[in-house]
Amino acid sequence: MKKRVIAIIACITVICSVLCGCVQQTVNLARVESGEMQFAQPASGDTVAVIKTNMGDIKVVLYPKLAPLAVENFVTHAQNGYYNGVTFHRVIEDFVIQSGDPEGTGNGGNSIWQLPFSDEFSDKLHHYTGALSMANSGEDTNRSQFFIVTSQPKGITDEIAALMAEAGWRAEIIDAYRQAGGAPNLDYRHTVFGQVYDGLEIAFDISFVKTDENDRPKEAVVIETIEVSVVE
């Protein structure tokens, strides 16, 4: 069963890669009508973070109960100033914007434990547009790098939806993907630990900047600081 799911995810990856070349640099951020937790506004007691960049602020809600390691790592790094001055070193339009590497090369960064930590997957967290997720180089290799999904809304075709259903994604998840857009090919490969609830337009603005042949922005996009707080 696992091999079949992996094969289907590979097919979704191919289709999504083709669709990435068919985008416009304008995005209509429609309201998503879904009971999935990533589309709820932060409530009292939730941990939130404001990623302050030189292009604007991106506000995310974090999910420590479902991804405790990833959240602890991100929050501790943020509070220690680890991400201050770090660039978005990898920007791919209609896919992701990636940061968290102090070296700015895509090869650097470490966890707060100075070792890679385990993946944390959940049926409740997925790579919808606006998802905050851990970058990795394979299974259980999470360190400090993270990305935000910036796939175009309405980008989930009937073909992709059918493949997702065949692989076992719940109907509610598929419906949410169809409304919000996203990158389902990243599910169960990367740890989702947060979701943008305000400032998604800033993430899209970053995704539209001009890049070189290595997907690096030609003009630096920088995280000035990340402020973490708990909703009262």
How should each PLM-predicted stretch be described?
Residues C20-E232:
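Cyclophilin-like peptidyl-prolyl cis-trans isomerases
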